[in-house]
Amino acid sequence: VFKPNEVWKPMGDCLPKGVKWVKDAVVALDPVKQQARTAGGQRFDYDFLVLTPGLQINWNKVEGISRETLGEGNAHCIYDFEGAQKTWTALQDFTTKGGRGVFTDTYTKLKCGGAPKKICLLAEHLSRKKGTRENIQFNYFCSGDALYNVPLYTPRLLQIFDERNIGVEVN
């Protein structure tokens, strides 16, 4: 596992030379005129346009959770830099103390449908490495009707979860 300073860079440092980074939301596109309009009212003409629609997580829409309190206690999210760090710290503690680990995914598969499975498997691995596996019950709950939405990989994933005694529940 990498340290935060080994994997994070300011976004501006990641852009190729000659790329103009517009830090605003596109609210209208006119592909015929090759124009984009932003929420801030700017219009851009383009010959070639790359849109990178981001994902905005609205914690205020989840009852009982806010961005500020996420990671306090036992509710964690791996989909942002700060949340991933808090999750790693919590996993270190959990795999030392033991208990019941409940891992979930979402119906929409948020940024990456495989990420929650990786975190569950990482936690299980840590517990084996620490010699605490027998003190932990792992459960993985899926909102959909399968562990993974890529049928080619689902049988092998189910086999791995079974081999590691991780209970899987599908909707």
What does each of the following model-derived ranges do?
Residues 22, 50, 102, 139-141, ...:
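Hydrophobic/aromatic beta-strand patches that form the interior of the parallel beta-sheet core
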Residues 29-31, 45, 58-60, 111-112:
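Short active-site-adjacent helix-start/loop capping segments
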Residues 39, 52-53, 61:
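Short, well-ordered coil/turn residues at beta-beta hairpins
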